[in-house]
């Protein structure tokens, strides 16, 4: 077994090289709940920074005085308060669904897995933010297409990272179980989103 690399950036890079090994090392290190929460805050804050180009665009579209302050305040609140709560709820859902398919993890391992998957996926989020900053300089159709491709790539990349790490933390030997877990999670999230009034 390899030791956990020193520093967050080195640990992220090592996890990119071997996703299952990365979560195995992280679980072996036994991060504290405070450490997990710190990861959630870090991910939320970096996602907030990556979303600044979109926030500026949203504020301009409102065409109201102080729109920028309102948009930024709302996004910062979501990043630092709602995002961590969402991660905890999603980790619990992941554990419940994985258990139904024979997963052998715990609620703790589900939290470690999801929170670390979010941290490892941060380069994708930051790259998407960079692309979003370039979109206004492009023709509208090309900008929309490029922005959509970047968002899709970041989303699918995150799902791949999360699924690979879940396979390890839940001791799934067969890929079918992982696919089933994530199909159920996606369906449940979509149903919940439809039930929440706009």
Which residues are covered by each model-predicted region?
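Selected alpha-helical membrane-embedding segments in polytopic membrane proteins
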Residues: 2-108
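Hydrophobic alpha-helical transmembrane segments and adjacent short intramembrane/lumenal linkers
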Residues: 77, 91-198
